[in-house]
A protein has these predicted regions:
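N-terminal alpha-helical interaction modules that lie
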Residues: 1-81, 105-160, 215, 219-247
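Residue at a conserved register position within TPR or TPR-like alpha-solenoid repeats
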Residues: 72, 90-91, 134, 170, ...
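Residue signature of alpha-solenoid helical repeat architecture, marking inter-repeat boundaries
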Residues: 77-78, 121, 162-165, 197, ...
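Structural register within alpha-helical repeat arrays
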Residues: 86-87, 91, 130, 166, ...
Length: 247
């Protein structure tokens, strides 16, 4: 655990180094020290096979990096920062979509790139990982603020990425909106998902929502009841033989 003084120093150091707009941070002493710590954390994670245990370990490690992240986001001017981008990915792996989005706004604004051997561009990576994090949350029966998902779609709307990736995010957004009772919003996202990927697996759900949203026929007024026929009263026949007519 770091002390309050250490966290403050870390935050200030991050802010100072992040203000070097065009200069690479690799020549900053404090940044290099933080990269050494990050590499040690990554080695710890690499030794863990279970994805669930690995996510739990990342959740344990993340608080250490919070002062650095805050310093960059508050005063940074767009210098490439591998620490920041790694923390963004770790936050997604632990289901912290809101925290990752906080970094993504900054990263996409300044065009930061993914560190190391990551082949996906930041918008591509972020969209896909947000979708996967939301899918894991949905599978666990938990909820996600759909505003985070729609903001991600808006933030990466003009970025190039496989259509199937964007379709994943539209699909899970639609499913959460459906669960929240927004049938019209859900239908729009699911329709967009199937436009982007015909194998998105949402056709039956689209049909169900379309039936739900289809206007119900207005109830017809009841037909007027027919007037009951008056039945002629029949005079009961007199008993006995009828009288003979006079001849």
């Amino acid at each position: 655990m770091t002390s309050p003084a250490q966290r403050h120093m870390m935050r200030v150091s991050a802010a100072i180094t992040a203000q070097r707009e065009a200069a690479p941070l690799r020549h900053a002493t404090v940044y290099e020290q933080m990269l050494v710590k990050l590499a040690a954390d990554q080695r710890t994670l690499k030794a863990i096979y279970s994805k669930e245990l690995k996510a739990a370990k990342k959740r344990e490690l993340l608080p250490f990096w919070l002062p650095w992240v805050n310093g960059v986001l508050e005063q940074g001017k767009g210098a490439q920062d591998d620490i920041l981008m790694t923390v963004m990915l770790w936050r997604l792996d632990t289901g912290d979509i809101a925290g990752a989005l906080e970094i993504a706004r900054y990263a996409l604004k300044y065009g930061l790139t993914m560190p190391g051997k990551h082949r996906r561009t930041p918008p591509y990576m972020f969209t896909e990982e947000v979708a996967l994090a939301a899918m894991r949350t949905h599978a666990a029966g938990e909820s996600v603020d759909t505003r985070l998902l729609t903001e991600t779609l808006e933030l990466t709307a003009t970025a190039d990425m496989p259509d199937e990736v964007r379709a994943k995010l539209h699909k899970i957004t639609g499913l959460f909106l459906r669960d929240g009772g927004d049938a019209a919003g859900a239908l729009a996202h699911l329709q967009r998902a199937t436009q982007l990927d015909c194998q998105a697996g949402v056709k039956k759900e689209i049909e169900r929502l379309e039936r739900e949203l289809k206007p119900k026929p207005e109830p017809q007024p009841k037909a007027a009841t027919r007037a009951t026929r008056k039945t002629r009263s029949v005079t009961p026949a007199k008993r006995g033989r009828p009288k003979k007519k006079a001849s």
